From Swiss-Prot:
<feature type="active site">
    <location>
        <position position="254"/>
    </location>
</feature>
<comment type="pathway">
    <text>Cell wall biogenesis; peptidoglycan biosynthesis.</text>
</comment>
<keyword id="KW-0274">FAD</keyword>
<dbReference type="GO" id="GO:0009252">
    <property type="term" value="P:peptidoglycan biosynthetic process"/>
</dbReference>
<dbReference type="GO" id="GO:0050660">
    <property type="term" value="F:flavin adenine dinucleotide binding"/>
</dbReference>
<keyword id="KW-0963">Cytoplasm</keyword>
<dbReference type="InterPro" id="IPR011601">
    <property type="entry name" value="MurB_C"/>
</dbReference>
<dbReference type="GO" id="GO:0005829">
    <property type="term" value="C:cytosol"/>
</dbReference>
<dbReference type="InterPro" id="IPR016169">
    <property type="entry name" value="FAD-bd_PCMH_sub2"/>
</dbReference>
<dbReference type="Pfam" id="PF02873">
    <property type="entry name" value="MurB_C"/>
</dbReference>
<dbReference type="InterPro" id="IPR036318">
    <property type="entry name" value="FAD-bd_PCMH-like_sf"/>
</dbReference>
<keyword id="KW-0961">Cell wall biogenesis/degradation</keyword>
<dbReference type="InterPro" id="IPR003170">
    <property type="entry name" value="MurB"/>
</dbReference>
<keyword id="KW-0560">Oxidoreductase</keyword>
<keyword id="KW-0521">NADP</keyword>
<dbReference type="GO" id="GO:0071555">
    <property type="term" value="P:cell wall organization"/>
</dbReference>
<keyword id="KW-0573">Peptidoglycan synthesis</keyword>
Amino acid sequence: MIIDFKKYSSVRIGNEFEVLVLDQICDFDGFLIGGANNLLVSPKPKNIGILGDGFNFIQILDRNKDFIHLRIGCKTKSSKMYRFAKENNLKGFEYLSKIPGTLGGLLKMNAGLKGECISQNLIKIATSQGEILRANINFDYRFCPLNTHFFWAEFKLNFGFDTLKDEALKNARSNQPSGASFGSIFKNPKNDFAGRLIEAVGLKGFSKGDAMLSDKHANFLINKKNASFEDAFFLIELARKKVFEEFGTNLENEVIII
């Protein structure tokens, strides 16, 4: 299938490329995309694949009075997982109301919010290399060590959807800028914030072409209208360079560049 990444990706940057649809668990020599919410696509990306619709599902494997055991396809959107948890009175997915993307992408970056993350209720992941138990995966902050493709995952959730947490999360990320963006450019370094460092070196609101380091939150890159890959990449590398020169801190990408 052909995907126009200027329309498909959240930052609205990219060209049209042929994307291979994977309808079953298999090896694939390339990059597997999800919702393209934290993705910047270059003019010459490597092979791109996407999961077929057969991996968009939530299946109940077991349930009792205390918990429910789910298998979820990695093309399933976070919003669908959140709604399922809320409708079935399940605890542990409340934060997904504020994190866009598909399950595969969430697992790849161990996505989370307010001290919670997608790996916390995980049992195992089905990959192109076989099924891998959570106990054998060394997740860390915004990090998953597995360099393979994900197809479905299983979770164990307790009952008791947290309505207070859900309400509190409604104001989470209210400081984030609007507009076409891939979210945070960099991971926060330990005991600091990437946005603070970028602002401290004078780059908050700095533009190159139609790409801008947001004047509301410096760790966000905004496509004002028709930003190019080159403009966006220039700003990312400029911010990294300036912060390292000033503070000796090497900012690590949260955005994935292919």
